[in-house]
């Protein structure tokens, strides 16, 4: 079978042991109550080094001090796992600037696509489509990934090609299918014509000249405030709320950890091992996306994609990196049969032999993973002029 080269990415009870989420297989150490991170920063002390997509930039000496920003971590998530770069600390002004940029369709070649176009709150910050759609209705080769809880994540995108959230934040602008700019300079030239943006960048970064690295910092800061936690499943296991989930879902949770082997990949409090796996997607139709291999050139990575979080999974259909499954039932059936055999199959993916009732209960558990912490990520009332 000849693998296909992917298109650009726009480019989804009483028998239970006590605290079944705890331990190395799933949520690990947890905290009671809501945790708060307070970051008070001086922007004038920055020396930021971004990767290829976001080159080195130094704020002007007269950059203002940033106002305190309080990142509230919902119950069930882990404060110690928060990743905020030293060269891009959170501030209220920067987060609000990032919000403007995230929702502004003018940051596309034809003024039709914003970051939020593919990351809609009602679809758990995906777009509800099999593959994402960019300018002029062009279709990408992959499903839009969720962008909440990115404050806990390392490599970004399905294939992990962006090492940081700052890099991820500016990559789509120069994707010909997504935002459509030929290069970052073209986009910056367009932004520089908007006096309101020059003013905001002056206030946040100390200079009117807009730099792509600072665009990435602002958008990444906003994305780090989009969270999902305090789900019924969290409250059942960690909060001791016995009635938070149904008995079917409780049985599904036990299956999740044991017979269904879900925690082999969907582990930890964010339900992801942050690694890359090949489950055989595409090998049945000769449409294999080479995935991680395109970056690593390691044959073991052929067809491997990053494990997505399962939080909000009931709202993020369709599923898999190519959006092939419309329902969670289809996903469970796929893994129950052991994926799709191929020469580079991850050995963790094996037939599960779940009964119909067990598959039903597992899906019921997955429906308990919707939470809160993202509801404040709304569009601004107005955009800079």
For each predicted feature, which ranges?
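Juxtamembrane cytosolic/matrix-side boundary and N-terminal portion
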Residues: 26-27
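Periplasmic c-type cytochrome electron-transfer domains
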Residues: 2, 6-12, 30-34, 38, ...
């Amino acid at each position: 079978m000849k693998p296909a080269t992917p298109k650009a990415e726009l480019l989804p009870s009483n028998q239970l042991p006590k605290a079944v989420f705890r331990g190395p297989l799933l949520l690990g150490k947890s905290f009671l109550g809501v945790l708060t991170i307070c970051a008070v920063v001086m922007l004038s002390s920055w020396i930021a080094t971004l990767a290829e997509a976001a080159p080195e930039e130094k704020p002007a000496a007269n950059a203002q001090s940033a106002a305190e920003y309080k990142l509230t971590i919902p119950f069930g998530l882990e404060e110690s796992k928060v990743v905020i770069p030293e060269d891009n600390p959170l501030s209220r002004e920067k987060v609000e600037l990032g919000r403007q940029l995230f929702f502004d369709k003018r940051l596309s070649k034809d003024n039709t696509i914003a970051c939020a176009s593919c990351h809609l709150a009602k679809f758990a910050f995906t777009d509800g489509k099999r593959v994402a759609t960019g300018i002029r209705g062009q279709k990408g080769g992959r499903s839009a990934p969720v962008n909440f809880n990115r404050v806990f994540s390392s490599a970004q995108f399905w294939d992990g090609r962006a090492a940081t959230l700052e890099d991820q934040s500016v990559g789509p602008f120069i994707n010909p299918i997504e935002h459509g700019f030929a290069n970052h300079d073209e986009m910056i030239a367009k932004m520089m014509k908007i006096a309101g943006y020059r003013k905001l960048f002056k206030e946040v970064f100390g200079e009117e000249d807009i730099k792509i690295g600072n665009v990435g910092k602002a958008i990444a800061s906003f994305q780090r405030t989009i969270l999902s936690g305090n789900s019924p499943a969290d409250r059942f296991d960690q909060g001791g709320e016995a009635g938070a989930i149904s008995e079917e879902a409780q049985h599904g949770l036990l299956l999740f950890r044991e017979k269904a082997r879900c925690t082999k990949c969907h582990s930890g409090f964010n339900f992801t091992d942050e690694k890359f796996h090949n489950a055989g997607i595409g090998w049945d139709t000769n449409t294999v996306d080479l995935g991680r291999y395109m970056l690593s050139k390691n044959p073991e990575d052929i067809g491997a994609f990053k494990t997505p979080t399962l939080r909000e999974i009931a709202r993020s259909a369709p599923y898999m990196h190519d959006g092939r499954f419309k329902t969670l039932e289809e996903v469970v059936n796929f893994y129950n049969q052991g994926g799709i055999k191929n020469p580079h199959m991850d050995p963790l993916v094996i037939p599960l032999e779940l009964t119909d009732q067990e598959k039903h209960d597992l899906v019921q558990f997955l429906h308990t993973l919707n939470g809160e912490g993202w509801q404040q990520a709304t569009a601004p009332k107005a955009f800079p002029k």
